[in-house]
């Protein structure tokens, strides 16, 4: 088995109301920053052992689908890196 870290980033789909991002965007604009858009996201770092990076990614995808993200309102990305 190899040690991996899977990073799952969960964000609201475009078009879903994101009050946290809206408030943050307004505050940044008041501070003089120019933005086109801002979205908030949650990031989960999962340490796990697996035979291959693909196996680790598959397990992280299952975690995202079953608990970390609601597929109706969320998009998510999974990245896997070998731990040293």
Where are these regions (language model features)?
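Long, contiguous binding/interaction regions
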Residues: 1-84
